Amino acid sequence: MYNRCCRKVWIQGRVAYRPAYIRQSPPQQTLYRGIDLLPFTTIVMDHQSGFQNPSPSGGLMFSASAKRFISRIVGFVGRGAEVQQKAVGLCPLKTERRRAAAGGLLLPTGLRMGRSIIMSVRPLPFLTGPAPSPDTAAGFKPSPPTGNLVSVSPLSKAQMALWFDYLQHPTSTHYFLTLKVELDKQPLSLDKIIQVIRGLGKQHAMLRTTFHVDTDTDDMSKSYMAVHDDSWDQEIHVLMNDAQLYEALRKPFQLSSESPVRWVVQMKLQPGSARSTYTVYAAGHHIGVDGASMSVLSNQLLEAVASEVEDQPDHSGPHYGDYIQRQARYLRSSAGAAAGRFWLSQLRHTQPFRWRMEPPEEINTPNYRQLDTWNFFPTAEIQEWGNLYKTSWFRVATSIVGLVTAAMAEPQAHHDHALMVAFGARPRGFENNVSHMANTMPVKFPLSSLLRDDATFSDAVKAMGRNVSTAKKHENFPFMSLMEQANRHMDPTLLDFKVAITYSPKLANKSCELFPVEGIWDLFFCFLEQEDGVALGVISNPRVFGAEALGQLQSLFNEVFALSKARPSFKLSDLAFLQNRTPARFISGPALDDVESISKSRVYRLIKARAASQPDLVALMSAEKGVQMTYRELAAQSSQVAHFLQKQRLCKGDAVLVHLERGFAQIVWILGVMEAGACYVALDKTWPAARKEAILRTANGKLLVTDDEQMDFEKQDTTVVFLAPSAAEIASMPQSTCECEVADDDLAYVVFTSGSTGQPKGVMVEHSNLSHYVSATRSLVKTGPHSRMLQLASFAFDAIVLEYAVTLAHGGTLCFANHPEVLVGEYLADVIDSNQVNFFHCTPSVLSTLPAGRRLPSLRIVSVGGEASPPGLLDHWRKRVELLHAYGPTECTVICTLESLTQDESTQTAIDATVIGKALPNLDIRICEEGKLEPLAPNQVGEICVVGPQVSRGYMGQEELTASKFHNITLADGHPSRLYRTGDKGFIDDDGKLHIQGRIGNREIKVRGYRLDLYEVEKNVMAFDPEVTQVSIQQVGESLVALVVPASIDCDRIRSKLLKDMPRYAVPTRFIRVASLPLNTNGKIDHTQASSLAAELVMHDTVLPTVDATPTPTAAVRAVGVTEENLRLKTKENGMERQEMLRRHLTAEVTALWAKLLGSSRQFDPEVGFFDAGGHSLLLTQLHKLIKERFGTGSRPSLLDIFSMSSIRKQVDCLMGIVDQDAMLGSEPTGGSSSRSQSRRSAETSSSSTSAPSSVPVDAERNLYAIVGISCRFPGANTAEQLWNVLMEQRDAITTFCPAENLGFALEENSVFVPRYGMIDALKDFEPSAYSMSDAEAQTIDPQKRVFLDVAADALADAGTSASPGNPLDPVGVFVGAATNTFLSSRDNPGSKPPGDEEPQSFANHYQQLLDCPIGTFASFKLNLTGPVVTLNTACSSALAALHLACASLSHGDCNAAVVGGVSMAYPQEGGYVTARPGGDSSAVFSPSGVCHPLDSRADGCVPADGAAALVIKRLADARADGCRVYAVIEGVAVSADGSDDKAGLGVPSSSGQSRTVEAALRRAGPQALSRLRYVEMHGSGTPWGDALEVQGLKMAFDRLSKTGAAEQSGTGRAQPEADRIYLGSNKGNCGNTEAASGLLSLIKASMALNLGVVPPLPNLAEPNPKCEFEETKFEPLGKQLALAPGDRVMNKRQRIVRSPNWISDATWFVISTVDNLLPKLTPAAVA
C-alpha cells in the first residue's frame, strides 16, 4: 500500500478530493464518476490507495460569514444555547485484543471494550438523548480522514445543516436516534451477530463513512464525507451491564474518526444456563441515518441473523452520492423552483411561537430530554378517526397539534405558526439506502384565516391537509435551501421553529423499537407506529415547559381529540382557549343584518363590552414612548370624563371641541364625550387661528378641552377646560359607566370638510350612522383581538373613525407615533416595525412613500382611499398584503364601498383602479342622472348616490346646501331612508361593482386625502388681495398651484395672509404670476386650459442647475478603511474663515434643493419653515432624500431632523456638524442630477471643481497628460470606489461556479476544469434605448461593445468634459484595446446557428466576424464623437498600448480629449477554465488551484477574468484651463517589444527587454521620478517564473539608472538614500487577469492610491516567491498597507507609481503622479 497526496477541487463551495498522482492505467483502478464535474461530484478512488492529509494545527475557527449563516439556520442550531447541560463523562476505549473484566469474554479482534461506569439506569429514558452541551472550546477541530478510502463526496443539504450543528455542539446528543432489536428468542452466537453487523457495514457505505472539514480553510461550507473500504474497523461494543450501556449509547460521536452508527451488543447470561441472550442497539447520528434507515437496518439485521448464508445480498441501491447529484439537479430544475415557491409560501406571514407561560423556576430533570408517552391509539380507532374526515389520521392529529400549541402561545393576529413536519423524502430507488434523506420542513397551520372565516374543525383539517398534501409533493426540497431563500426575503428572527411533528412507520416486528432524535425544538410530537396501533410521545424542552405546562398541554390535546371524534364540525371559536380571538366580531353585539339592532347599538358601549370581557387586552400603545393602556383603563378613564362633562351641565347634542395633541387623551375624551350624550368636534392644533374660530362659531361649542394654556384663537363664549389643572378633578370622578340615554339620531361627532370658505362645512354624523359603519366593516375589515392598527390620520379627518372606532370595537390595539405629522417614508416604516402594526389606512400618496426595500413583516392589511389610486401602486401592494381599495365621502360615514384585493404574488392581471367594490352591508349605491333620483341601468354612467343608514344628517348651519345634497326617500319595502348625492361620476357593472370616473361639474378635488373646492380657494385669494384680477387654482401632482393676474402681484404676501386663516393643505404651494389666463367662448376662465398651462409652467419652473450627488469623502474614506487624518487635505484658511465658507456653501446647496421642490424662481427666507414656504409632508420626504443623496451622510440627518429643523438655517446648522468641511469646500453648489441616459447621450456635466494655478511651468506641461474621467466594471466592482474597497479589504472577487453538466469543449488528457472565473456584473443595467437601439438588436451585439459603450459614456460624464459631441472643431478620440470577439460564434449569441444546423447562410452571416464593426468605431458612432478612432489587440497590454497612442494623438493635436478603454469578455461563459493538472505541464499559465498568488511562494498561475474600463485624458494644460478634476498626471511612457534574442519562448517575458522599457519610461518622466519612487504596480500574473523575470527586469533597469546617476538628483538638492525599499504589488490576486482591460485596472488602482495616500497590499501574502530573490534587490512585495506622504508644495516633491508589463512579449510602462496644488480639489469619492 502507498499514500498519495490529494489536490482539492472546489465545487460550489464543497470539496472533493482528487489524487494528484494519475496513473496511465485502466479505468477500474481509478474511476472518476461524472468526469464533467457535476455540482456535487462523487469521486471514487482506487481501492488500493491510502489517504493522507496534513495534521491539523490550531483550533476550529468559524469565519464571519459562516457564523452568520449558522445563526440563520435557526431550525437546527439556533436554539442550542437554551438547553445546555454538562457533557457526559467518558472513559477511554481500547482497541487491542483483551479479556473483558466481567464474564471473562474474549472479544474478537477489532472490537472495543468500554470500562465500567457504575450508574443505575432503569428503565432506559436516556435513549431520547441529553440536551445540547455548551459551545465547545476553540481548540476543537475535526480531524482529516485516515485509512483506505473508496470515495469522497460533498454533504447533502440536510447533512450540511446537521454538520453545522455538530461543529457547534460536538458533545451534544440531541440528534441521536437509536434502534433497539431484541434477539432473545433465538439461539445465536456472538460471532454470528458480529458477522452480521460487519456484513451490514460492507453493504451500506454510510456505515463506513466519516465527516471532515478541509484543513486549509476555515470555511465550514467546504466539508465532505469520506467512505472507507471494507477493512474499516466498525465500532462495536459488547457490554454486560446497564452502566456500560449508558456510556456506549450516550457517548458523543467523533464523526471524523468513527462512522455515524455505533453498534452496541448487550449480552445477558441466562441464570442456570449456558445460553446467552442478546440485545443489539444501533446508536446513530442523524447526519448519517434517519428513521427509514433504521427500519431498513432492523429488517436486514433480523433477516441476516436468521439466515444460514454468510454473505447477504446487497439491497442498498444507488450510492448516496447519486442522491446528492440528483438533489442538485432537482434544485436547478423548474420543479425545484416551484417547490421553493411553495415552501416560501408556508413561511409567509408566520411568526415564531411566543409561549404564554413563564419558564419553570427549577429544573429537576436529568441532563437529557425524556420521551413522555401521552397516548396509545389502537389501529381500528385511529383508522376510524381518519375516516370521519376522509383523510389520513396523521393530518387530523397534526391539526390538533396546531390548535393546542397555539393555545399555549401568545395570540398572533393575522399571522400563523409553522409546524416542522418530518417527511421521508426518499426518491424512488433509494428505499433501502441507509443514509440521511429525511427532511423536516415548516408547514403552515392557517389558524388566522380559519378564525377569520369562523371555520369548523373539519375545515381546519381540510386546510391543513391541503398544505401537507402539497408539501408531500415537494418533500425533496432541502430545508437548507429553503433557509437560504428565506433569508433573502424574510427577517431571520422569524425563522425560529419551536414545534415539530414526526411519524415513524413500524419496524420489522415487535422485537424492534426506535427511540427518535430529541431534536432542538421546544415540543417534538412523535407518532410511533407499532404492531397494533400508534403511540404518541412528546419530547419537550425542560427549560421552557415545566410539568404543569405539559400537563395542561396534554389535557388540551385529549380534550380536542375527544371532541374531534364526537363532533367533527364543531366551531373553532367554541373552544375555550380560542374564544374572543375571532376577528371582526363584537362582544354581545348585533348581527350584521339586524338593521334595527345596529341602529340602537352604540360604539362606546361595544368598547365597554370588550373591556368587561377582556379587560387586560391592550387598547392603546406607543412603542416609541414605551407606554400602553388596557381596555380596563380606557373604559374607566372615559367614564370619568363622561361624569365630569355631565357635571358641567352639558345637554344631549351639545358640541365639545377637543383641542389636544394626538395621543391617548384624544381617545379617552372622544369616548367620554359620546358616553355623556354630547358630540365631539376635533380641532387640529396645526390649523390657523381663523380656521379654529370659524369652526367654533359654526359648531356653537359649549365646551372646549385643551392641553394648550396659551391658545392662539378667540374662545368666544365657550367654556374652556384646561387639561392639566382639571386632571385631579377628573381623576376623582366615578369609573362606572355614565347612565345617559343616547338616541339613534343624536349626534356622535361633527367633522369639518374643505374649510376653504369663511363658513366651513360641518358634516353631522349621528350615533346610528357611526354604529352602522363600524358594524358593516366586519364584512371585510378583519381586525380583532391583538390586531394592531396604526393611528395615522388627523383627528379632524374622518379616517380617524376607522382607526379608533373599528379597532377598539373589535378588540384591537391602536398604535400611536411620536411625530404623526411626518408619518411617511422611512419613519412610517420604522413606526410600523416598532409597533408591529398589522393594519393601517392611508391615502395613495402616503402609501407611495413607503420604501420598497422594507420588508414590514407584521403588516398584513392596507386600506387605501381618499383620492385616486394609481394602478401600479395597487398592483405592487397587492402582491405584499391584503389590499382594501376604499371609497366613501365624509357625508356617508367614512367608507361606503370596499374592493378587497387578496394577496397574490403571482398575479399578472392588471388592476383596474376605477373599481372600488360593492356597497357595505345595509347600504345601496345608485347611479342617477343629475337632478333625478331614479336609478339608471347597469353600465350607464351617472352621478353616484348613496342610500342607507350611514348617510349623515347634513351640514351644520347650512340648510340650503344640505337640501341640495341630501334627500329623504322611501325604499321599496316602505321604510324611510336618506340619499346623498356625492357629485362623483361612475357606473355599476354587471357584477354589482362600482366604477368611479371623476367629478361632475364642480371643481371639488381631493389633495393628499383632504377634500377641497378649488372655487372656494379662488374666492379667498381674490378676497385677500383686491389687486388680483384673475386667479385659477389647479392641482399639479400632490400640490396646489395658483395662476394669478396681473404679473406684478406680490405672491408671498398673499400666501402669508392665506396661511393665517386657512389650513395649510388648502393654501397653494406655488403662486405663478401670468399676464393673462385663457378664456372660453363665454368669456370665463377656461380652467381646463389653465390646468395644462399650470403643468407646463411648473415643469419649466423646476429646471435647475444639476446637483452634484457625489458622496462626500468622509463616506468614501470610511468605506476604504483609511483614517481621515491620513487623508486630511491641508488649506491656508483659518478655522473661522473655513466655517463661514462652509455655511455659505451649504446654504446655497440647501436653498437650491428647496427651489427644486418649491419653485426655482422664489427667494426663500432662511428663517422660514419648509411647511410655511409651501411644503407638505410628501415633499418633506423628497427633501430628506435629496439632502441625504447630496451630502452622503449615512443615517443622518433623519427625516425627523429635517422635520424638526424645518428652516434653511436650521438645516444648515444640522449639516454643519455632519459633513466633512474640507471635502465640501472642494465642490460648488448646483441643483440636481441628470439621468444616466442623459449623461450617456450628452456626456455633459458641470464641473464640480476648478484648479488653482500649478507650480508646474506651462512649457513643462507639454508632454504631461491628465486623467480627468474614470469608469470601470471589474469582478466584484462596478465603480472605481467599489474596486478600491475590494483592493483595500484584500477580497477575492473571483466567482466559484457550479459547472454545467455539459461543457462546451472536451477535456484533454491530464487537463482539469477549474470552476473559477472573474465575472463582471455589467449587462443588467444596459439601456438599449439610451443608444437608440431596440432590445432585440442589443442582444445580437457583442457584449464587449455594450459594456464598453456604458463605461465610455460614464467616463465622459465623470470627466465633465467641455467637448461637444458631434462638433468637428472640438474632437474627442476613442482608443480602445479589446479582446477578440468570441460572442459571434458562441452558443450564447441568439443569432448563431445551433450545432448540426446545415441551413445555408448568407454571405453577411458567413463573414460576420470579418465584417464586424470594431468596438472603437461603434462607440464613437453611438456617442457621436469625431476624433481619431483606434481599436487594437496586444493581449494584456492592449489598454496601455491604446493609452500610449492616445497620448501621442493629443500631443500631435489630433484631438482635444481622448476616451481610452480596455475591454475583455469571453464567450461562451463556461464558469471556469481548463488548465494542466497539478504536476503536469509546467508552462501552463492558468492556476490549477483556482487562486492567483502574485509574488508569492504559492504562485501556480493566474485566473482569467472579464473586465472593462475607460479613462478620459487631456493635455494637462487643457485640463487646468477647463477646470477639470484631475485624478493623476501621466509623466512618462514607454512601449517596446522584447525581440527574441534572450527569450525562452514567445509567451515568456524577457528580463532585458523589460528593463529597457522601464528605464525609458523613468527617463522620460524626468530626473525626479526615480528619487521619489515608492511603489511599482506590476503585471504580477502569479506564475512563478513570470513574476521572477519581471522582478529581474526591474532590478536591471534600476542598476543601470543608478550607474548613470539618474537617481542622484532628487529635485530638491539632496540625494535620496538608495537603501529605501521600493514595494511591489499586483491586482491579479483580487480580480484575476482581465486581459485587455488589465492595464487600466492597474492604472486606476495607482491613481486612487496617489489620491488617498495609501497603497492596498497584496491579498493574503504568505512567503515571497523565492525565485524572485528579493533579498538581492531593493524591492519587496507589499504585504501591508503602504502610506504615501502627500506632495509638499514648497519642495515640489511628487510620488510616482510605475505600471508594469504583460505576460507575453511586449511591454508598456507609465509613470504617473499627482499635481500637488491640485490635491485639495481631489476627493476619494470622485472616482466612484
UniProtKB/Swiss-Prot annotation:
What Gene Ontology molecular-function terms does this entry list? 3-oxoacyl-[acyl-carrier-protein] synthase activity; ligase activity; phosphopantetheine binding
Cofactor(s) needed, names only, are:
pantetheine 4'-phosphate
Stretches for region Condensation (C) domain = 153-499
Q: What class of enzyme is it?
A: ligase
Q: What is its EC number?
A: 6.3.2.50
Annotated Low complexity bias: 1226-1237, 1244-1255
Similarity field: In the N-terminal section; belongs to the NRP synthetase family.
Q: What is this protein called?
A: Hybrid PKS-NRPS synthetase TAS1
Species for this entry? Pyricularia oryzae (strain 70-15 / ATCC MYA-4617 / FGSC 8958) (Rice blast fungus)
* The encoding gene: TAS1
